Amino acid sequence: MKFDTVIMGGGLAGLLCGLQLQQHGLRCAIVTRGQSALHFSSGSLDLLSALPDGQPVTDITAGLDALRRQAPEHPYSRLGAQKVLTLAQQAQTLLNASGAQLYGDVQQAHQRVTPLGTLRSTWLSSPEVPVWPLSAQRICVVGVSGLLDFQAHLAAASLRQRDLNVETAEIDLPELDVLRDNPTEFRAVNIARLLDNEEKWPLLYDALSPIATNCDMIIMPACFGLANDTLWRWLNERLPCALTLLPTLPPSVLGIRLHNQLQRQFVRQGGIWMPGDEVKKVTCRRGTVSEIWTRNHADIPLRPRFAVLASGSFFSSGLVAEREGIREPILGLDVQQTATRAEWYQQHFFDPQPWQQFGVVTDDAFRPSLAGNTVENLYAIGSVLAGFDPIAEGCGGGVCAVSALQAAHHIAERAGEQQ
């Protein structure tokens, strides 16, 4: 099977790269083993929240300039501030075109409220998520009886420290009792599958309506809206106060929705989606990828002109830790890591951890190297890249988006030259 590009990994980076390549008229396939990290994320995307020295970032342009001085090997530093901002804006346009109408500005970070009621600097958020400063003084944090994925009293306690009048309440929907037989089934995603049925909408409205008359804003867990935000908008039009949603413990309704919107758009535009498959071997000839062998296609290889590695980091098994060191399991690419295992981590759990910055070694075009030699038609994007800490620096989503579009533009340019 011949393709212009085969992407190994179907997470945020892989999907955005595929969508951008389709804009250039290239035929793409995505091989994906299972659920991506988006299923376990908040659904919000960070661009740059803090510098390596811990200084918070609000002005993104100034932050990118400072980042280049502090971390010259960071993926952003390799591209330059203006290029990063341009690609981030293109990514936001691509997300909106896929149906993910996210709120945010590439020039200026905003503060979103987290499930614990604290504030986190971010780039893009779902419109349902409350953004600081809140537009209300009287707030009610509403939990769902029996839902362990969200603790209303914890969020309320944090918000009270910001001089807000915050109460808590709990709604009990007997219609959800079918899920209560097994506590492991009473999760936000399963509740959403039930509440998203239009016939159930009035039940949720009836439960929230008495609470809404006594406050200016309701904050509740994101336990509906798995396909779109239609129910949220329907409730906001009818309730006498604003309704906002906070992501829950994973799996996350907002994260799954974002992934599904991107995946459906990729397929709509003619992309080949290969779920439940796994790349077992990649054949390289004369420094280029010639064939990709997958578990489901056995002896029928995929033959791409270009290949993209978007396999993620440790969480997605894009990187594997062993006693001897860190390795990239598909091709055995060169990996940037510390000299000894003892240097992988810091003693204090909440300190920035060195292993977070491990990843494949690439050139400035994000082409990785194998035994010191660049693989000419292979690009590495997203969390598999080295040189950044997605947690401490708050840049995971941004690196995925920016590197994906950079690789896509580079591939499109080279594909045009080869025609």
Swiss-Prot record:
This is Anaerobic glycerol-3-phosphate dehydrogenase subunit B. GO terms for molecular function: glycerol-3-phosphate dehydrogenase (quinone) activity. Pathway: Polyol metabolism; glycerol degradation via glycerol kinase pathway; glycerone phosphate from sn-glycerol 3-phosphate (anaerobic route): step 1/1. Its EC number is 1.1.5.3. Belongs to the anaerobic G-3-P dehydrogenase subunit B family. It catalyses: a quinone + sn-glycerol 3-phosphate = dihydroxyacetone phosphate + a quinol. Its cofactor is FMN. One of its GO terms (biological process) is glycerol catabolic process. Conversion of glycerol 3-phosphate to dihydroxyacetone. Uses fumarate or nitrate as electron acceptor. It comes from the Bacteria. One of its GO terms (cellular component) is glycerol-3-phosphate dehydrogenase (FAD) complex. Composed of a catalytic GlpA/B dimer and of membrane bound GlpC. HAMAP family: Glycerol3P_GlpB. It holds the Pfam family FAD_binding_2. Keywords: Flavoprotein, FMN, Oxidoreductase. The keyword Oxidoreductase applies.
